[in-house]
Structure formats: structure tokens, C-alpha cells
Amino acid sequence: MADSSEAPDLMEDVGVPTGATPDADNPGWYSWGDFPRGSFAAATGRLLFKPDGPGKGICRMFPTELHMNMGGSLHGGSVMSFIDMAMFAGGLCAGMERGHYVTLDLTTHFLARGRPGSPLDAHVELVKQTRGHAFLQGVVRQNDQPCYSFTGTLKRIRERNAPA
């Protein structure tokens, strides 16, 4: 057992997801680095995340022209993919128990048009954690203005790629 006078492992202490490292270009933020090329996650682009107090985390996306719809704003599918990923990264930063989860539901309200070129910040709140589920809610802001609100439920599963 570790001596209580030892400094805690920062990555465990702040609730940062496993495998995350401090982002050199954004002090105070963490990242998993680049997602595997050609993966669905890679289409979202670089994700940053950080704890934001007890039960809260923030996840950041950098939308580009690739995330736009034909009307010139961010495509709803790209926004919902980001929110889905933010529930995991932001939820872990908020103190969600470590484990493998799948999304059971995600409800998104589109409040304002998001635009490329300015970061999206998903402010994630862990509302409740049970043995098998995590209940989350949040607001995605761009330039400090709310663009999307969401609620979602994640189900903890026993092993990856196994039936729930």
C-alpha cells in the first residue's frame, strides 16, 4: 500500500480517462492523441478533455469544413457523434467509474447553429452512476453560447464486443 505522504498519481487523482496525456498545445487539457486513421472516431478530429469540478467534465472538438452540412452549419450527425464521444471522455473526467460502456440513449436538442473554425465545448455532468449505468447531461457551447443540449445513458458491459 502506498504511503499517504506520497504524491498521488495525477492521472488517477483528477479522473482523466485511461491512456490520456497532457496536451502540449493546450495547458490543462488532456488528449488520447490522434485516433487511428480511417476509423470513425478520426472523422471527429482531435478531442481534448479535462475535469471541471466534482461530477463535471469538459470535452472539446475543433470543427472544420469537413463537419459542415449543405446549409453551411455543422452537420447534426457530426455534432451527435461528438456528443456521444464527449459523454465517455467527459463522463470519466466527471468521475464516472472506469469500465467499458455502450450508449443506450442520447437525446440532443439543437438550440443554435454551430459553425466551423471555433471550438465546441461539451460541458458534461454525471447525474447518477449505478452499478450498470451512467446517466449524463450537458450543454455544448461555441464561443460561450449554448448550441446544443443533451441527455444520455451509458450501459456498463462486462467485456468488449460481447453481448450486453
Predicted regions and their residues:
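Terminal targeting signals and extreme-terminal segments of soluble enzymes
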Residues: 1-164
